[in-house]
Protein backbone atom coordinates (compact mmCIF):
# COMPACT_ATOMS: atom_id res chain seq x y z
CA UNK A 1 0.00 0.00 0.00
CA UNK A 2 2.80 2.32 0.95
CA UNK A 3 4.58 1.55 -2.32
CA UNK A 4 1.40 2.20 -4.27
CA UNK A 5 0.97 5.63 -2.64
CA UNK A 6 4.53 6.54 -3.49
CA UNK A 7 3.94 5.67 -7.14
CA UNK A 8 0.76 7.76 -7.22
CA UNK A 9 2.50 10.75 -5.65
CA UNK A 10 5.35 10.44 -8.12
CA UNK A 11 2.94 10.30 -11.05
CA UNK A 12 1.11 13.38 -9.77
CA UNK A 13 4.36 15.28 -9.31
CA UNK A 14 5.43 14.32 -12.82
CA UNK A 15 2.12 15.49 -14.28
CA UNK A 16 2.40 18.81 -12.45
CA UNK A 17 5.95 19.25 -13.72
CA UNK A 18 4.89 18.52 -17.29
CA UNK A 19 2.01 20.98 -16.96
CA UNK A 20 4.30 23.69 -15.59
CA UNK A 21 6.80 23.11 -18.37
CA UNK A 22 4.01 23.24 -20.97
CA UNK A 23 2.58 26.42 -19.46
CA UNK A 24 6.00 28.01 -19.36
CA UNK A 25 6.57 27.05 -22.98
CA UNK A 26 3.20 28.60 -23.97
CA UNK A 27 3.97 31.76 -21.99
CA UNK A 28 7.36 31.95 -23.62
CA UNK A 29 5.85 31.54 -27.06
CA UNK A 30 3.26 34.23 -26.33
CA UNK A 31 5.92 36.58 -25.01
CA UNK A 32 8.02 35.91 -28.09
CA UNK A 33 5.03 36.65 -30.35
CA UNK A 34 4.37 39.91 -28.50
CA UNK A 35 8.01 40.94 -28.88
CA UNK A 36 7.90 40.18 -32.61
CA UNK A 37 4.60 42.07 -33.07
CA UNK A 38 5.97 45.04 -31.16
CA UNK A 39 9.10 45.03 -33.29
CA UNK A 40 7.01 44.88 -36.47
CA UNK A 41 4.79 47.76 -35.30
CA UNK A 42 7.82 49.88 -34.48
CA UNK A 43 9.37 48.96 -37.81
CA UNK A 44 6.22 49.99 -39.68
CA UNK A 45 6.11 53.29 -37.77
CA UNK A 46 9.74 53.98 -38.65
CA UNK A 47 9.09 53.07 -42.27
CA UNK A 48 6.08 55.40 -42.44
CA UNK A 49 8.10 58.20 -40.86
CA UNK A 50 10.86 57.63 -43.37
CA UNK A 51 8.48 57.58 -46.32
CA UNK A 52 6.77 60.75 -45.13
CA UNK A 53 10.13 62.49 -44.93
CA UNK A 54 11.01 61.29 -48.42
CA UNK A 55 7.65 62.37 -49.85
CA UNK A 56 7.83 65.77 -48.13
CA UNK A 57 11.31 66.38 -49.48
CA UNK A 58 10.26 65.27 -52.96
CA UNK A 59 7.20 67.54 -52.84
CA UNK A 60 9.29 70.50 -51.66
CA UNK A 61 11.88 69.85 -54.36
CA UNK A 62 9.21 69.58 -57.05
CA UNK A 63 7.61 72.80 -55.86
CA UNK A 64 11.02 74.52 -55.85
CA UNK A 65 11.96 73.58 -59.41
CA UNK A 66 8.53 73.98 -60.99
CA UNK A 67 6.84 76.66 -58.92
CA UNK A 68 3.89 74.27 -58.49
CA UNK A 69 2.39 73.45 -55.12
CA UNK A 70 1.33 69.82 -55.47
CA UNK A 71 -0.64 70.00 -52.23
CA UNK A 72 -3.23 72.03 -54.10
CA UNK A 73 -6.21 70.30 -55.63
CA UNK A 74 -5.59 69.38 -59.30
CA UNK A 75 -7.47 71.68 -61.65
CA UNK A 76 -9.70 68.86 -62.92
CA UNK A 77 -10.98 68.17 -59.39
CA UNK A 78 -12.05 71.76 -58.72
CA UNK A 79 -15.71 72.69 -58.59
CA UNK A 80 -15.60 75.31 -61.35
CA UNK A 81 -13.88 73.13 -63.98
CA UNK A 82 -16.32 71.80 -66.61
CA UNK A 83 -16.15 68.49 -68.41
CA UNK A 84 -16.60 68.25 -72.16
CA UNK A 85 -19.20 65.93 -73.65
CA UNK A 86 -17.19 65.84 -76.87
CA UNK A 87 -13.49 65.80 -77.68
CA UNK A 88 -12.07 69.32 -77.75
CA UNK A 89 -9.01 70.66 -79.51
CA UNK A 90 -7.46 72.19 -76.46
CA UNK A 91 -4.55 73.03 -74.27
CA UNK A 92 -5.55 73.46 -70.63
CA UNK A 93 -3.43 75.98 -68.75
CA UNK A 94 -3.68 76.97 -65.09
CA UNK A 95 -2.95 80.60 -64.37
CA UNK A 96 -2.98 82.27 -60.98
CA UNK A 97 -6.48 83.67 -61.28
CA UNK A 98 -8.15 81.34 -63.76
CA UNK A 99 -7.90 78.12 -65.75
CA UNK A 100 -8.30 78.20 -69.53
CA UNK A 101 -9.06 75.55 -72.13
CA UNK A 102 -7.52 77.08 -75.25
CA UNK A 103 -8.80 75.96 -78.64
CA UNK A 104 -5.80 75.48 -80.90
CA UNK A 105 -7.92 75.79 -84.06
CA UNK A 106 -10.09 78.76 -83.16
CA UNK A 107 -7.27 80.51 -81.26
CA UNK A 108 -9.75 81.56 -78.59
CA UNK A 109 -10.73 79.76 -75.38
CA UNK A 110 -13.20 76.90 -75.26
CA UNK A 111 -13.87 78.00 -71.70
CA UNK A 112 -12.37 79.99 -68.86
CA UNK A 113 -13.13 79.04 -65.25
CA UNK A 114 -12.33 80.62 -61.91
CA UNK A 115 -13.41 81.06 -58.32
CA UNK A 116 -14.05 84.59 -57.04
CA UNK A 117 -14.19 85.49 -53.34
CA UNK A 118 -15.43 88.56 -51.56
CA UNK A 119 -11.87 89.43 -50.49
CA UNK A 120 -10.60 89.23 -54.07
CA UNK A 121 -13.29 91.61 -55.29
CA UNK A 122 -11.98 94.49 -53.17
CA UNK A 123 -8.35 94.19 -54.35
CA UNK A 124 -6.49 97.36 -55.30
CA UNK A 125 -4.13 96.21 -58.08
CA UNK A 126 -4.17 98.58 -61.07
CA UNK A 127 -5.39 97.40 -64.47
CA UNK A 128 -2.58 96.01 -66.65
CA UNK A 129 -3.91 97.05 -70.11
CA UNK A 130 -1.22 95.20 -72.07
CA UNK A 131 -2.37 92.23 -74.14
CA UNK A 132 0.31 89.62 -74.87
CA UNK A 133 0.36 86.01 -76.17
CA UNK A 134 0.18 83.34 -73.49
CA UNK A 135 3.74 82.04 -72.90
CA UNK A 136 2.42 78.67 -71.70
CA UNK A 137 0.75 77.80 -75.00
CA UNK A 138 2.61 75.42 -77.28
CA UNK A 139 2.17 76.23 -80.95
CA UNK A 140 0.08 79.02 -82.44
CA UNK A 141 -1.41 81.71 -80.25
CA UNK A 142 -3.41 84.76 -81.25
CA UNK A 143 -1.83 88.19 -80.98
CA UNK A 144 -3.25 91.61 -80.30
CA UNK A 145 -2.53 92.51 -83.95
CA UNK A 146 -5.21 90.02 -85.01
CA UNK A 147 -7.79 92.35 -83.48
CA UNK A 148 -6.57 95.61 -85.01
CA UNK A 149 -9.00 97.01 -87.56
CA UNK A 150 -11.31 94.01 -87.11
CA UNK A 151 -14.23 95.99 -85.73
CA UNK A 152 -14.22 93.82 -82.60
CA UNK A 153 -13.02 94.46 -79.07
CA UNK A 154 -10.55 92.22 -77.31
CA UNK A 155 -13.22 90.93 -74.97
CA UNK A 156 -12.08 89.44 -71.67
CA UNK A 157 -13.58 86.17 -70.52
CA UNK A 158 -12.16 86.28 -66.98
CA UNK A 159 -12.41 90.04 -66.47
CA UNK A 160 -9.50 92.17 -65.31
CA UNK A 161 -11.86 93.58 -62.69
CA UNK A 162 -11.93 90.17 -60.99
CA UNK A 163 -8.13 90.00 -60.80
CA UNK A 164 -7.36 93.12 -58.76
CA UNK A 165 -6.30 90.96 -55.81
CA UNK A 166 -2.89 90.04 -57.28
CA UNK A 167 -0.45 91.61 -59.74
CA UNK A 168 0.35 88.30 -61.44
CA UNK A 169 -3.32 87.41 -61.78
CA UNK A 170 -3.97 90.83 -63.30
CA UNK A 171 -1.10 90.46 -65.77
CA UNK A 172 -2.24 86.99 -66.85
CA UNK A 173 -5.80 88.19 -67.42
CA UNK A 174 -4.38 90.08 -70.42
CA UNK A 175 -3.07 86.95 -72.13
CA UNK A 176 -4.68 86.55 -75.53
CA UNK A 177 -5.87 83.08 -74.47
CA UNK A 178 -8.38 84.90 -72.24
CA UNK A 179 -9.95 87.08 -74.94
CA UNK A 180 -12.30 86.74 -77.90
CA UNK A 181 -13.44 89.04 -80.73
CA UNK A 182 -16.43 90.70 -79.08
CA UNK A 183 -18.90 93.33 -80.21
CA UNK A 184 -17.90 96.66 -78.67
CA UNK A 185 -21.35 97.55 -77.35
CA UNK A 186 -21.72 94.12 -75.78
CA UNK A 187 -18.25 94.28 -74.23
CA UNK A 188 -18.81 97.70 -72.70
CA UNK A 189 -22.51 97.18 -72.01
CA UNK A 190 -24.45 94.09 -71.00
CA UNK A 191 -21.42 91.76 -70.72
CA UNK A 192 -19.74 94.29 -68.43
CA UNK A 193 -22.94 94.63 -66.42
CA UNK A 194 -22.97 90.89 -65.78
CA UNK A 195 -19.31 91.03 -64.68
CA UNK A 196 -20.26 93.67 -62.13
CA UNK A 197 -23.26 91.61 -61.01
CA UNK A 198 -21.03 88.56 -60.46
CA UNK A 199 -18.75 90.64 -58.23
CA UNK A 200 -21.77 91.75 -56.25
CA UNK A 201 -22.83 88.11 -55.79
CA UNK A 202 -19.32 87.25 -54.59
CA UNK A 203 -19.46 89.98 -51.96
CA UNK A 204 -22.90 88.92 -50.71
CA UNK A 205 -22.14 85.18 -50.67
CA UNK A 206 -18.40 85.12 -49.87
CA UNK A 207 -17.62 83.12 -53.00
CA UNK A 208 -18.90 82.32 -56.50
CA UNK A 209 -17.74 79.91 -59.18
CA UNK A 210 -17.73 81.14 -62.77
CA UNK A 211 -17.32 79.48 -66.17
CA UNK A 212 -17.56 81.52 -69.35
CA UNK A 213 -16.57 81.39 -72.99
CA UNK A 214 -17.61 81.63 -76.62
CA UNK A 215 -20.15 79.67 -78.64
CA UNK A 216 -18.78 79.18 -82.15
CA UNK A 217 -20.92 78.06 -85.09
CA UNK A 218 -19.67 75.77 -87.86
CA UNK A 219 -19.33 78.43 -90.54
CA UNK A 220 -17.61 81.03 -88.38
CA UNK A 221 -15.97 84.24 -89.54
CA UNK A 222 -12.34 85.00 -88.68
CA UNK A 223 -10.18 88.05 -88.02
CA UNK A 224 -6.48 88.76 -88.35
CA UNK A 225 -3.56 87.04 -89.99
CA UNK A 226 -3.98 84.07 -87.65
CA UNK A 227 -7.65 83.58 -88.57
CA UNK A 228 -9.02 83.98 -85.06
CA UNK A 229 -12.59 82.66 -84.83
CA UNK A 230 -15.40 85.15 -84.24
CA UNK A 231 -17.96 83.72 -81.78
CA UNK A 232 -21.65 83.73 -82.60
CA UNK A 233 -22.44 84.26 -78.91
CA UNK A 234 -21.05 84.01 -75.39
CA UNK A 235 -22.07 82.07 -72.30
CA UNK A 236 -21.51 82.45 -68.60
CA UNK A 237 -22.64 80.14 -65.80
CA UNK A 238 -22.47 81.03 -62.11
CA UNK A 239 -22.62 78.81 -59.03
CA UNK A 240 -22.98 80.01 -55.45
CA UNK A 241 -23.89 78.67 -52.01
CA UNK A 242 -26.50 80.64 -50.07
CA UNK A 243 -28.62 79.86 -47.01
CA UNK A 244 -27.52 76.22 -46.97
CA UNK A 245 -28.31 75.61 -50.63
CA UNK A 246 -26.42 75.53 -53.91
CA UNK A 247 -27.77 77.75 -56.71
CA UNK A 248 -26.78 78.03 -60.35
CA UNK A 249 -27.75 80.18 -63.29
CA UNK A 250 -26.64 80.54 -66.90
CA UNK A 251 -26.53 83.41 -69.38
CA UNK A 252 -26.19 83.56 -73.17
CA UNK A 253 -25.43 86.76 -75.11
CA UNK A 254 -25.48 87.09 -78.89
CA UNK A 255 -22.26 88.71 -80.13
CA UNK A 256 -23.97 92.00 -80.97
CA UNK A 257 -25.37 95.12 -79.34
CA UNK A 258 -28.02 94.42 -76.74
CA UNK A 259 -28.74 96.93 -74.00
CA UNK A 260 -31.32 94.72 -72.29
CA UNK A 261 -31.98 93.80 -68.66
CA UNK A 262 -29.76 90.95 -67.46
CA UNK A 263 -32.69 88.69 -66.69
CA UNK A 264 -33.56 88.57 -70.41
CA UNK A 265 -30.26 86.73 -71.03
CA UNK A 266 -30.79 84.23 -68.20
CA UNK A 267 -31.03 80.52 -68.98
CA UNK A 268 -30.81 77.33 -67.01
CA UNK A 269 -27.40 75.70 -66.82
CA UNK A 270 -28.97 72.69 -68.54
CA UNK A 271 -29.77 74.90 -71.55
CA UNK A 272 -26.23 76.27 -71.65
CA UNK A 273 -24.87 72.72 -71.54
CA UNK A 274 -26.89 71.84 -74.64
CA UNK A 275 -25.51 74.87 -76.49
CA UNK A 276 -21.88 74.35 -75.51
CA UNK A 277 -21.45 70.58 -75.17
CA UNK A 278 -19.99 71.17 -71.71
CA UNK A 279 -21.02 69.61 -68.41
CA UNK A 280 -20.80 72.07 -65.52
CA UNK A 281 -20.30 71.59 -61.79
CA UNK A 282 -19.81 67.83 -62.05
CA UNK A 283 -18.11 67.63 -58.64
CA UNK A 284 -21.45 68.27 -56.96
CA UNK A 285 -23.54 65.21 -56.00
CA UNK A 286 -25.71 64.24 -58.98
CA UNK A 287 -29.01 64.89 -57.22
CA UNK A 288 -27.96 68.44 -56.30
CA UNK A 289 -26.43 69.14 -59.72
CA UNK A 290 -29.51 67.89 -61.56
CA UNK A 291 -31.87 69.93 -59.40
CA UNK A 292 -30.10 73.30 -59.43
CA UNK A 293 -29.24 73.21 -63.14
CA UNK A 294 -32.94 73.28 -64.03
CA UNK A 295 -33.33 76.86 -62.82
CA UNK A 296 -33.36 79.57 -65.47
CA UNK A 297 -34.89 82.31 -63.34
CA UNK A 298 -32.77 85.32 -62.42
CA UNK A 299 -35.20 86.15 -59.61
CA UNK A 300 -35.10 82.61 -58.21
CA UNK A 301 -31.29 82.60 -58.27
CA UNK A 302 -31.12 85.83 -56.26
CA UNK A 303 -33.89 84.94 -53.79
Can you say where each PLM-predicted feature lies in the sequence?
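Bacterial N-terminal signal peptides
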Residues: 11-19
Amino acid sequence: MKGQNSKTALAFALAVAICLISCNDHAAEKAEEEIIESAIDKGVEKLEEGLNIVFDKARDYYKEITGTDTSQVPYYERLEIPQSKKKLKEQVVEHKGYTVSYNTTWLIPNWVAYELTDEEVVGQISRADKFVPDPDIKGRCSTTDDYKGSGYDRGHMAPAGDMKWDAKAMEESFYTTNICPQNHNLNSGDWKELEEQVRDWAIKNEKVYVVCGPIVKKNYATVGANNVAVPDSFFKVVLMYRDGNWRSLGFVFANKSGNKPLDTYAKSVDEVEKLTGLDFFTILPDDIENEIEKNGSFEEFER
